[in-house]
């Protein structure tokens, strides 16, 4: 372990803050850039996660203050701010917590005049997906789904899709 640490820390990649210097054994796929691991391995089952029940009171004033400052900065500098919730596994998204979180962020963004999209509400026709398209219950997508989602995200943000048919109106649908 010591020799490996010396080898890594003396490399040009490490000195230049490159991810190439980091060995990550449990990422599920190669590092693709900008914090993205292209996970392509199918798992026998999802990596379990400790899913925490949604609790609005757990959002600190500091976080809300940071959000407000971000909104103010964007408005002052004529920057369009769009907030999104990326999709998680279908099984996890229907447990009620996603719906509660989505309702909270919908209200918060409406209060500040910020556009918000909950991509858990994408129809299955728009983005076909199953739990098998994810690495874990938290919503880390396998690469193929991440590619498809990125295309849909871009089409929504660029206003190139019919949002009235791309999204379900409620989680019950």
Could you describe each region identified by the protein language model?
Residues 70-96:
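Active-site segments of SGNH/GDSL-like serine hydrolases
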Residues 57-63, 90-99:
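Acidic-and-aromatic substrate-binding clefts and catalytic sites of carbohydrate-active enzymes
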Residues 63, 81-90, 105-106, 159:
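Long, well-ordered mid-to-C-terminal structural blocks that present hydrophobic/aromatic surfaces
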Residues 1-76, 165-173:
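Secreted/periplasmic serine-hydrolase-like ester/acetyl group-modifying domain
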């Amino acid at each position: 372990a010591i020799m490996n640490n010396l080898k890594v820390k003396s490399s040009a990649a490490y000195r230049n803050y490159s991810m190439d210097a980091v060995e990550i054994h449990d990422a599920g796929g190669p590092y693709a850039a900008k914090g993205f691991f292209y996970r392509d391995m199918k798992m026998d089952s999802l990596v379990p996660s400790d899913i925490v029940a949604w609790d609005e009171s757990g959002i600190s004033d500091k976080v809300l203050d940071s959000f407000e400052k971000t909104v103010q900065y964007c408005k002052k500098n004529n920057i369009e701010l769009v907030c999104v919730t990326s999709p998680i596994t279908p099984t996890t998204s229907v447990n009620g917590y996603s719906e509660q979180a989505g309702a909270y962020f919908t209200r918060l963004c409406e209060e500040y005049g910020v556009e918000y999209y909950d991509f858990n509400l994408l129809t299955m026709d728009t983005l076909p997906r199953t739990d098998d398209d994810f690495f874990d219950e938290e919503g880390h997508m396998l690469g193929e789904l991440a590619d498809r989602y990125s295309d849909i995200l871009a089409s929504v943000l660029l206003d190139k899709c019919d949002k009235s048919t791309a999204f379900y109106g409620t989680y019950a649908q």
